[in-house]
Amino acid sequence: MLGFLRPLRGRAWHAPVPDLEWNCEETLRHLINTQLWYAAHLASRSTRRLAVWRDVDPRLDVDGLLDNLEAHISVLAAVIRDAPPEARSWHNSGMTDPCGFSAMACSELLVHTWDIGRGMDAPFALPGDLSARVVSRLFPMWLPIDTAPDQALLWCNGRVALPGRPRLGPDWGWWSRPVEEWDGTDPDA
């Protein structure tokens, strides 16, 4: 994602992102916040929502924001690597394991990089193998999805419609708890 975003530094980061309430810079700031928020929760094994400081310094330019994104991704990756598989921490979609935090972070990074690309008219190609793993981990309630993995991930995140499947509304959700705990029902139903 950083390899895609860094060359866009000179573009208009205040450009709106289609179908979001944020512009490109606000979407980038959200990405930075999610990585730190996930890391803080998993590292602490909190059973409740933490009041994690989430606002990136408003004075940072795009280069500074991208550096922060890289740093926050690295912190989260280290926390995930060091967490035992049985670790759990709070997320509004349930007590989440390291694999769930990893999948949520990947979903955020892939989909919001795609969003930023749309806002800047610079198409971002989601990697199919990673998209498939994220879909199978976070969205077991909708499997199988008979389409390309990148389109499946975008559909699961409410970004596109698929043949025979209308675009999901803003209240879509994912399964962040261990897949073994899923009872076969749609958590949003």
Give the ranges of each region predicted by the language model.
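Alpha-helical bundle segments that constitute or directly flank the non-heme di-iron/ferroxidase center
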Residues: 1-8, 25-44
